Amino acid sequence: MRRIFTFFLTFLLGMFVTALYAQTHTVSGTVIDKDANEPLIGANVLIKGTTIGTVTDLDGKYTLQAGDKDILVFSYLSMKTIEEPVNGRTVINVKMTSDTETLGEVVVTAMGIKRQSETLTYSAQTVGGKDVNDIKSVNMINSLQGKSAGMMITPNSTGAGGSSKILFRGNKSISGNNQPLVVVDGVPVMMNITNSQVDSNYGGQRDGGDAMSTINPDDIAQITLLKGASAAALYGAVAANGAIMITTKSAQSGKVSVNVSSNTTMESPMVLPEFQTTYGMSDNGTFSWGEKLSSKAPNYAKKFFRTGFTTNNSISLSGGNENIQSYFSYANVYSQGITPQNDYRSHNLNSKVGFNILKDIHIDFTAKFTNQHITNQAAAGYLWNPLTGVYLFPRGEDWNGYKENFEVYDPARGCYVQNWTNTQQQQFGNPYWMLNRQIPITDRNRYEFGGSIKWDITPDLNIQGRMRYERGEEHWVHNAYASSVGNLYPMGRMKDNRYFSDQLYGDVLVSYNHTFNDFSLSATAGSSFTKTKTSHVDLWGEGSQFSQPGSGNIFYPNIFTPNNYYGNMSTVGKDDNWMTQKRLNSVFATAQLGYREGIFLDISARNDWSSALAFTESCSFFYPSFGGSVLLNKFVDMGKNIDLFKFRASYSIVGNDVPVFMSNLLYSLGSQGAITPPDKAPFRTLKPEKTHSLEIGFDGTFLQNRLNINLTYYKTNTKNQFFSVAAPYESGLRNRYVNAGNVENKGFEFSIGWYEQFTDHFSWSTNLNFSYNDNKIKELVDDLPNGLTLTDFGRSEERR
């Protein structure tokens, strides 16, 4: 009897659920900003009178189950609330307009967590995709110049395809990395393939590019700049210098949409060095301090450069329904640098597919491929840089003669050699010889594959898992003809480098958001891992002396094959091959408590385990972050002309990870198979750098959100800097590492903006940014009476 009753009760319950389900159907659509004609991220969509609802995704899309008689309520901070009856519709698209009585925007913060801007306890600035696309560049990040206080972007002088140096609030590390972390859709990306920084002064270190140049600007929906350590603390050691959060576009449900864009920009040198034009060439044919010229020498530098241009072409397709959405884009870039024969080409393919599984589970897959081809990219130093010869060309000499006849035949060598005022010196040479006989060629491929799954367990609780794999490949060939670099390579040089980089990243996040009467709680906890691998294969050979066949050097000049380099491995090198692997495991948590939407308290914590510290006393390091903000306008009647009057403060301690192979002995294999012992002592007590950051600020908007003002004061101290110093003679080693030093940055940032909406189709906005940073080295290594000398090939810097 009990079984029959149970079966009957289950049957009735099933019929009830089925009947209830039959009364609802899937409703989807897109919510956009009517004024900007852009999707709204994080807009709330609720069934009126219930707690059932959802939020729009990165492209303004939403999907939920609703009945025919239900009313959907669309709300978004700073927008007027809209109510739409379902009435049997399956697609409801909404255009929202500004509400001058409210304020705020949704900001994508660390780990991809979305928050209302007015709740943040630190400085964060958002830039729309349109701002990046107004004036496109080969490197997308260059389009952000001047758009944020406290951010300095310096494109390298290596020409088209080169990287850019990005600084938030000054240099913090003397020996380590100062670049901010780049994050795409919540996941950190590899900054460059070669893992090199362009800082060589003499040896001509090349530019390995960066991840920003592989991003199609038309794929960008939003960029958030997290300039302080507190803002990026959840990313841990890799984000001690801040983070650039890039949110890309996804597919929208509905009919297929196609977007096509093409633009061309031109550039030319704005400022050139001033040259003396009174004295001619010196006796050695190198400098310009010889006899006084009878007439003023012309400015040859102006004749060297050309007008550069960059053309960007892009097409994207998106579409789908409530169950599956897809987005595809293709872009190509062709650029001619201002240096002759410096050309850049790239192709970018990007695809994203999203699936709504059941009611509460969403899955995304992404795939991306980028190919870059660069010719005649100048080196960072002056050894292989044609600009050195342009700027130091002896005054009064025949520029056109060296341009048209950059090489002459040398019967002794049986080949053409460089024609220059002094072919024996190494500092600089004929720039046209370099452009035609020392051509560096770079080919890069970058592959990215990723996926994520999110389960909305309840309207307040969700769990999300993400994973991304990246692979970078680079092939760099630089063959120099005989007589290059003066007497350094009289018979030429062959160089063939291949770099490979792999990064695997994964994380799991659990998020909870709930409002309890006057209180609100937003919390996220999770774990992540990052595994990187970099390898390098270098084949090179040099003709460093005039040789006869069989002498152990080059056989025929200007034939760049390994077989042309004779005998021993000192002339054909394979010993510059290496591989590094690194792993970083982390756990983290963050929580924000709000009171009456006017007081907010933040706390974050993270612990990292780095394989670079595996041989030290502890490979683990912990750091916290705290913050608070008060919106006085929520508690004090300030009149209709004050929309937001907010004060904020935050404090954090964030680590900066160290390079590999510092805590253990590193043996290398020589070209003859011999094992080479290390020349540096293992650093068993190595500690990561720690950045202590304090930030205090004010945010205000006035006159119905027309006027906005932001002011921030900050102070950072980065301690535990790591240095290489001379080891005691009796140790048998050359150097040892030490933790020491304190680098301080303090300053303020100020920005003011005005926005005016004249009509539905015409608006005007302007912004002014100003920042000041005082960068000082407060402490260095103790017990070094002669100071600390940091050396690079051909350069030394003494710091006291």
Regions found by a protein language model. Give the residues of each.
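Low-complexity intrinsically disordered tracts that form flexible linkers/tails across taxa
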Residues: 193, 374-393, 780-784
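Short small-residue beta-strand/loop micro-motif enriched in glycine and branched aliphatics
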Residues: 191, 327, 335-338, 488, ...
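Acidic, glycine-rich flexible loop segments
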Residues: 310-311, 382-433, 437
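Extracellular/periplasmic, surface-exposed regions of secreted and cell-surface proteins
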Residues: 179, 290, 308-311, 346-347, ...
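Short, small/polar-rich motifs associated with maturation and membrane association
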Residues: 2-9, 15-350, 355-358, 362-364, ...
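Structured core elements
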Residues: 107, 126, 152, 167, ...
